[in-house]
């Protein structure tokens, strides 16, 4: 009986640890735990685009780590295939980060992004892909969502975000207006990616530093 209980507990812990995070709104392209460390979580094909506010709109995630560092960024490419597509528009304009770099504890969290304020020429009907980069301490993970931006679009009432996690006291000072000079190339052996992978510089180090700071505060 003891052995059986031990197995059950171990299985529960393992399954919980494997489920890193999900992008719940806007709905992600898909989720497979084993490929979440790849570009767009391993889902490299553009899906049906969902309506999303041109101005401020909510993003909902479910974080399965005790503490995780998050940042959001977008691509204006009709078919982004690498992190390079999230750095510049087709005419070479640098795309700022869509959110600050901030931390969240475990659980369902939300934050707001204002894509129109990025000043990269987005208008009513613009098509973009949103990518969330997440680090819970065991490497960067990704989820993507394909969107069409609608001026004045009202999200479902149950998807609004009033307790914005990116505005919490542990959010960093990196703003959505920061340039993509904060991105740098890093090679990856993950399948399904094309070209050099672009990741936020020092993202893992920042996550560690913020975690240490949190421990000191505690």
Swiss-Prot record:
Annotated knockout phenotype: Exhibits growth defect on copper-deficient medium ot in the presence of the copper-specific chelator bathocuproine disulfonic acid (BCS). Shows a reduction in cell-associated copper, in the enzymatic activity of Cu/Zn superoxide dismutase, in laccase-dependent melanin production and in the accumulation of cellular iron, a well-established copper-dependent process. Shows a distinct cell wall electron density pattern, which is not due to overall difference in cell associated copper levels or copper adsorption ability.
Named cofactor requirement(s): Cu(2+)
UniProt membrane topology term: Lipid-anchor; GPI-anchor
Subcellular location: Cell membrane
InterPro entries listed in its UniProt record: BIM1-like, BIM1-like_dom
Cofactor binding summary note: Binds 1 copper ion per subunit.
Glycosylation sites recorded in the entry for this protein: 87, 91, 124, 158, 170
Swiss-Prot/TrEMBL induction comment: Expression is highly induced in response to copper limitation by the copper-specific chelator bathocuproine disulfonic acid (BCS). The BIM1 promoter harbors three conserved Cu-responsive elements (CuRE), which are critical for CUF1 binding and activation under copper-limiting conditions, beginning at positions -239, -268 and -516. Consistent with their presence, binding of the CUF1 copper-sensing transcription factor to the BIM1 promoter is strongly induced under copper-limiting conditions and expression of BIM1 under these conditions is CUF1-dependent.
Stretch list, region Disordered: 160-194
Molecular functions per Gene Ontology: metal ion binding
Signal peptide bounds: 1-19
Residues at which Cu(2+) binds: 20, 65, 138
Entry keyword Zinc: no
Positions of GPI-anchor amidated serine lipidation: 190
Propeptide positions: 191-218
Keyword Metal-binding: yes
Keywords linked to the UniProt accession: Cell membrane, Copper, Glycoprotein, GPI-anchor, Lipoprotein, Membrane, Metal-binding, Signal
Family membership: Belongs to the X325 family.
PANTHER family: COPPER ACQUISITION FACTOR BIM1-LIKE DOMAIN-CONTAINING PROTEIN, HYPHAL ANASTAMOSIS-7 PROTEIN
Function of the molecule: Lytic polysaccharide monooxygenase-like protein that has diverged to biological functions other than polysaccharide degradation since it does not perform oxidative cleavage of polysaccharides. Cell surface-bound protein that functions in the copper-accumulation pathway shared by the CUF1-dependent copper transporter CTR1. Involved in maintaining cell wall integrity during copper deficiency. Binds Cu(2+) with an estimated 1:1 stoichiometry and might serve as an extracellular copper ligand.
Name of the protein in question: Copper acquisition factor BIM1
Lineage of the species this protein comes from: Eukaryota, Fungi, Dikarya, Basidiomycota, Agaricomycotina
């Amino acid at each position: 009986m003891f052995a059986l209980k031990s197995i059950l507990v171990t299985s529960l812990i393992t399954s919980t640890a494997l489920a890193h995070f999900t992008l719940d709104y806007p709905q992600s392209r898909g989720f497979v735990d084993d490929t979440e460390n790849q570009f767009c979580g391993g889902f490299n094909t553009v899906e049906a685009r969902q309506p999303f506010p041109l101005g401020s709109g909510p993003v909902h995630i479910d974080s399965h780590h005790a503490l995780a560092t998050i940042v959001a960024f977008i691509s204006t490419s009709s078919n982004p295939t690498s992190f390079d597509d999230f750095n510049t528009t087709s005419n070479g304009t640098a795309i700022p980060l869509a959110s600050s770099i901030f931390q969240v504890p475990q659980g369902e969290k939300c934050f707001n992004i204002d894509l129109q304020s990025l000043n990269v020429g987005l208008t009513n009907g613009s098509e973009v892909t949103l990518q969330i980069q997440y680090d819970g301490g065991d490497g960067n993970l990704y989820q993507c969502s394909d969107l069409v931006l609608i001026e004045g679009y009202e999200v479902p009432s149950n998807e609004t975000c009033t307790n914005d996690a990116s505005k919490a006291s542990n959010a960093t000072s990196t703003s959505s207006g920061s340039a993509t000079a904060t991105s740098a190339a890093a090679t990856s052996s993950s399948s399904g990616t094309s070209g050099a992978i672009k990741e936020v510089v020092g993202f893992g180090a920042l996550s560690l530093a913020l975690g240490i700071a949190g421990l000191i505060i505690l």
